[in-house]
């Protein structure tokens, strides 16, 4: 009988197979649930991926049997150290790789979280380690059934998916253009997205109504990290997780990881968000942006200068475009894209004014008009790609491009145009981005620079030996330098300057004012995840009608997007040419939403988004979020798309009670509403009667 080694406390008990070194049991001590439901699916504790120096091929190396396990105690912490001295080359009869590893697992006496590190020792002249998948778990689900399990996945601003064992195997996920499920030769379904960009944060969470599982990377070096999820599907139900680090370990070298965290809880995903935030608060700082930006609730997005050879507006039209946005919607912030040579998504990164749109003088004069009429301008710059048809592709594009392990460039296609991905950790490209952004602020009077794709598209490892990065996984550090130095430089030109990026990245948020957040309804998008974890970060949400939808579907989607932006306190992203296509009823709803957003802004400025915390019960069919207000008081925002009449909102009763409750809504109604004290078990609650006839979005202030 193989001996098991254990590590645990009152929260959990972890068991390690003494021969194979894999997790054999993982028990929640409060619920008694052993998360490991499929022993046959249980995998190794780690996997290595190495380059065969002779063939140049990438091979998978699996740990062979354990050579030693040490148990330790130091103060209030216990530990296990599991040592392996070699690795088996998967799928071959090759001699074992002389690559050893030691896994350390450490836990405090009264903490649901354990910390995991791995040390890799490469003594094999045949192989160079380039990827480390660790920690790695397989064979899990929670409770008696997997069908009520929920996964929280940090794809862009977040996903929340019920029953991923099933959903991740459907055509919906198999057919995604990014972050898609793939099926391996072994029949295993998997998703893997890299941090920081496609994955906005470095943690995942899995829970049901009694159990929780948290996996996070506490990597202060911010290496490119693949957040991997696996499942056997409904016919072989289990889930798996892993964190992949891209790092080179050559023969004779040793590499030790930063900690990863594994926690066994009885809580939902909010616990994971708070725990991750507690860690990262010691690593990053919150942004310090100009005060006037707190009053910006909407921006005028102008992608309508030149696209695919078609001219829609010229630089001389900027004053009238600005005036129209200001008059119709109160827009002061003019976001200018498609201004560069050949227009949107062409000839990047040639960020020079397109000659057919006008002269640099006309562009500068247009910006001056905006600035002199109480507005300000943000310019679009793509921070990622180089058009292969550019005149400079052979001389600069190929040199700056990222290279994979075979020396090939990473190619991406947008519309009819092909690009290569540039290496943000190569100093030449960094300097070009920094200087182009600075030039737009100095020469054209812009206050904002928007770096497209920076927090949205996937990071990759770069193997180009001629680049200035010290290792293959330094993608994120490159963009951090760009953001930090560009912000400092443009603030030196104009202290009111700021940066924006596409989508979200926790480490990038320290340097930006707004993240243009989008994902896709089919992705189980859940923007509340990023907003709750980082309530200080401003999200800019797309609030335009969808071109691919018509009729009722188009109307419902616009209502949903506007309502979500109101609940999250996001800045509205609206294009005048798109708003002009709205029917009268939808146009009226857009304007009503803008009015409500402006009325809510003083509350958002002194509030903190806490998602549904403190909400005990809500009427069916309604979505409710909670903002805690500085100085006392609570704001509850309710989206009621079906216009369900009445109902009761039950909330935790704040200390000191409630003096009174008022409401206002998207239709312009407002007034006092009734509430009464009640209880749920031992807890006191406030039962707030929702007014009949209220609008689709209802705001409740409890003082």
Residue ranges and their predicted role:
Residues 195-207, 615-656, 697:
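Carbohydrate-binding surface patches
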Residues 6-8, 179-292, 316, 552-553:
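Beta-strand-rich recognition/accessory modules
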Residues 296-316, 346-360, 414-434, 465-479, ...:
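The substrate-binding groove and active-site-proximal loops of carbohydrate-active enzymes
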Residues 309-315, 361-363, 367-368, 376-444, ...:
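Active-site-adjacent "subsite" loops/lids of carbohydrate-active enzymes
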Residues 677-703:
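C-terminal beta-strand-rich structural cap/linker in extracellular carbohydrate-active enzymes
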Residues 392-419, 423-427, 477-584:
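Glycan-recognition surfaces
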Residues 3-8, 12, 33-91, 106-224, ...:
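Polysaccharide-binding surfaces and accessory modules of carbohydrate-active proteins
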Residues 264-345:
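An acidic-aromatic substrate-binding cleft motif
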């Amino acid at each position: 009988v193989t001996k098991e080694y254990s590590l645990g406390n009152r929260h959990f008990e972890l068991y390690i197979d003494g021969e194979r070194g894999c997790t054999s049991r993982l028990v929640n001590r409060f619920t008694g649930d052993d998360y490991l439901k499929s022993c046959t699916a249980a995998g190794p504790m780690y996997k290595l991926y190495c380059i065969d120096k002779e063939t140049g091929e990438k091979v998978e190396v699996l740990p062979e049997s354990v050579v030693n396990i040490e148990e330790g105690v130091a103060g209030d912490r216990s530990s296990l150290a599991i040592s392996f001295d070699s690795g088996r080359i998967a799928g071959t009869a090759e001699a074992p790789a002389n690559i050893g590893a030691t896994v350390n697992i450490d836990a405090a006496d009264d903490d649901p979280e354990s910390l995991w590190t791995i040390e890799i020792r490469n003594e094999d002249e045949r192989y160079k380690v380039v990827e480390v998948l660790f920690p790695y778990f397989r064979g899990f689900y929670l409770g008696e059934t997997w069908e009520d399990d929920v996964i929280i996945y940090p794809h862009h601003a977040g996903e929340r998916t019920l029953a991923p064992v099933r959903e991740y195997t459907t055509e919906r996920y198999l057919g995604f253009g990014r972050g898609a499920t793939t099926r391996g030769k072994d029949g295993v379904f998997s998703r893997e997205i890299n941090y920081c960009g496609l994955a906005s944060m470095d943690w995942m969470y899995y829970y049901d109504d009694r159990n929780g599982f948290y996996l996070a990377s506490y990597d202060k070096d911010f290496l490119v990290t693949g957040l991997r999820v696996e499942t056997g599907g409904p016919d072989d139900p289990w889930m798996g997780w892993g964190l992949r680090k891209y790092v080179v370990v050559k023969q004779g070298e040793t590499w030790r990881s930063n900690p990863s965290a594994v926690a066994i809880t009885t809580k939902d995903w909010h616990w994971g968000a708070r725990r991750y935030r507690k860690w990262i608060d010691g690593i990053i700082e919150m942004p310090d942006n100009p005060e006037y930006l707190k009053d910006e609730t909407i921006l005028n997005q102008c992608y309508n200068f030149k696209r695919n050879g078609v001219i829609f507006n010229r630089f001389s039209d900027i004053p009238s475009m600005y005036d129209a946005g200001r008059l119709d919607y109160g827009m002061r912030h003019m976001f200018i894209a498609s201004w560069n040579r050949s227009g949107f998504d062409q000839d990047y990164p040639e960020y020079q004014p397109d000659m057919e749109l006008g002269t640099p003088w006309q562009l500068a004069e247009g910006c001056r008009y905006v600035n002199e009429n109480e507005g300000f301008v943000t310019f679009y710059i793509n921070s990622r790609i180089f058009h292969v048809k550019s005149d400079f592709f052979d001389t600069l594009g190929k040199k700056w491009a990222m290279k994979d392990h075979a020396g090939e460039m990473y190619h991406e296609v947008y519309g009819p145009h092909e690009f290569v991905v540039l290496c943000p950790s190569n100093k030449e490209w960094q300097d070009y981005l920094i200087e182009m952004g600075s030039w737009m602020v100095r020469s054209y009077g812009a206050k904002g620079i928007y770096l497209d794709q920076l927090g949205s598209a996937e990071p990759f490892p770069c193997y180009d030996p001629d680049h200035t990065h010290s290792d293959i996984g330094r993608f994120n550090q490159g963009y951090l330098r760009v953001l930090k130095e560009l912000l400092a430089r443009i603030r030196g030109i104009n202290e009111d300057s700021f940066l924006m990026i596409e989508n979200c990245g926790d480490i990038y948020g320290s340097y930006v004012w707004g993240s243009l957040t989008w994902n896709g309804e089919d992705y189980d998008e859940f923007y509340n995840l990023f907003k709750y974890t980082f309530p200080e970060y401003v999200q800019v949400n797309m609030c335009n009608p969808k071109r691919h939808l018509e009729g009722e579907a188009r109307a419902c989607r616009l209502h949903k997007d506007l309502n979500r932006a109101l609940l999250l306190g996001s800045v509205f992203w609206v294009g005048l040419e798109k708003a002009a296509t709205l029917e009268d009823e939808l146009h009226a709803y857009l304007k009503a939403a803008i009015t409500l957003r402006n009325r809510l802004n003083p509350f958002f400025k002194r509030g903190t988004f806490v998602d549904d915390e403190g909400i005990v019960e809500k009427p069916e069919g309604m979505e409710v979020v909670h903002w805690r207000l500085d100085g006392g008081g609570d704001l509850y925002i309710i989206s009621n798309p079906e216009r369900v009449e009445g109902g009761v909102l039950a909330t935790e009763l704040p200390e000191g009670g409630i003096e009174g409750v008022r409401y206002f809504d998207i239709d312009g109604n407002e007034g006092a509403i009734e509430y009464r004290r009640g209880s749920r078990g031992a807890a006191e609650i406030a039962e707030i009667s929702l007014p009949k006839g209220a609008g689709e979005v209802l705001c409740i202030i409890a003082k």
